[in-house]
């Protein structure tokens, strides 16, 4: 898949999104910062990437996801948990960054912060019904199928 990428900050030419390995699903996104950003516990910040994408094809969307190491080791996750980039969006990719940890975290310029995953999209059409066909689960949820 070819994807249109617009470089909004010339410094990002040296830090284009890339797959870390041949088997990686996510492209690493970096913080396009002029100086280190300190996030105290509980702080949030909207961090620019210096990049914009245009998927153009309504059969695709992009997800911005946290990097597992930052979340597990430092408590750095996405403030919105998952960022959804629609196919017609053309603005800068921003990363809502939240320090849910117990200590300050310093995010350095051009540090890998999140990952971008391209996913297929199915746009549903609703069929209005009065009742559903019976299923084994029915309306059971929130642990109704058991714990183990």
UniProtKB/Swiss-Prot annotation:
GO terms for molecular function: dUTP diphosphatase activity; magnesium ion binding. It is an enzyme of class 3 (hydrolase). Keywords: Hydrolase, Magnesium, Metal-binding, Nucleotide metabolism. Coiled coil: none annotated. It catalyses: dUTP + H2O = dUMP + diphosphate + H(+). Its EC number is 3.6.1.23. It holds the Pfam family dUTPase. Its cofactor is Mg(2+). Substrate binds at residues 67-69, 80, 84-86, 94. GO terms for biological process: dUMP biosynthetic process; dUTP catabolic process. Pathway: Pyrimidine metabolism; dUMP biosynthesis; dUMP from dCTP (dUTP route): step 2/2. SUPFAM superfamilies: dUTPase-like (SSF51283). This enzyme is involved in nucleotide metabolism: it produces dUMP, the immediate precursor of thymidine nucleotides and it decreases the intracellular concentration of dUTP so that uracil cannot be incorporated into DNA. Belongs to the dUTPase family. This is Deoxyuridine 5'-triphosphate nucleotidohydrolase. It comes from Burkholderia multivorans (strain ATCC 17616 / 249). The gene is dut.
């Amino acid at each position: 898949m070819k994807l249109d990428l617009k470089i909004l900050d010339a410094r990002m030419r040296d830090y284009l999104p890339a797959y870390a390995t041949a088997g990686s699903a996510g492209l690493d996104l970096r913080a396009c910062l002029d100086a280190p950003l300190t996030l105290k516990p509980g702080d949030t910040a909207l961090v620019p990437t210096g990049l914009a994408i245009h998927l153009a094809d309504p059969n695709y969307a992009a997800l911005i996801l946290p990097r597992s190491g930052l979340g597990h080791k430092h408590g750095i996750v996405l403030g919105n948990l998952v960022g959804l980039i629609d196919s017609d969006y053309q603005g800068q990719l921003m990363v809502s960054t939240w320090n849910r940890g117990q200590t300050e975290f310093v995010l350095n310029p051009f540090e890998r912060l999140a990952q971008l995953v391209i996913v297929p999209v199915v746009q549903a059409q609703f069929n209005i019904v009065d009742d559903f066909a019976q299923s084994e689960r029915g309306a059971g949820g929130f642990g109704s199928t058991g714990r183990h």
